[in-house]
Design a protein with these regions (language model features):
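C-terminal, charge/polar-rich interaction regions
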Residues: 115-117
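Anionic N-terminal interaction surfaces
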Residues: 1-44, 107, 111, 123-125
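Canonical phosphoinositide-binding patch of PH/PH-like domains
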Residues: 95-113
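Phosphoinositide-binding peripheral membrane targeting modules
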Residues: 26-43, 47-99
């Protein structure tokens, strides 16, 4: 099933990393971090309520933009595992904000991401 549309955001998750301590400052009461991933310039964290993507900008990285995608905004998602010639897996999210594509590094288990999104999206409904 191909649903081609322009992405409002494209992120690349390179590897799973420990949960950054500074993300705790943006969590609401009762929100728990589940997993974190290194991105090209910063990190992404799956929590019990949303996906948080931090994007450090500039030469010093002191300017930080934070994207927050509540699971309730996700209408549909797809996952694609790596193939013989295509070494990277992908996750696509169709949200109220638009289409988001996440490219996964070869060391990331796409099925773990699928289970994580499934649990969070379906529980939040």
């Amino acid at each position: 099933m191909s649903m081609e549309m322009a992405s409002v955001a494209t992120w690349t998750f390179l590897a799973e990393v420990p949960i950054p301590q500074d993300v705790l400052g943006v969590l609401v009461e009762g929100e728990q971090p589940y997993a974190a991933f290194k991105t090209m310039r910063d990190s992404a964290v799956f929590t019990s309520k949303r996906l948080i993507v931090r994007d450090a900008q500039g030469l010093t990285g002191r300017k930080v933009e934070i994207y927050s995608l509540p699971y309730s905004a996700i209408n549909m998602w797809s996952t694609e595992n790596a193939g013989t010639f295509d070494m990277n897996s992908e996750v696509e999210l169709w949200t109220r904000a638009g289409h988001i594509k996440i490219k996964l590094g070869s060391q990331i288990d796409v099925r773990k991401i699928d289970r994580l999104i499934s649990a969070c999206v379906l529980i939040s409904r």
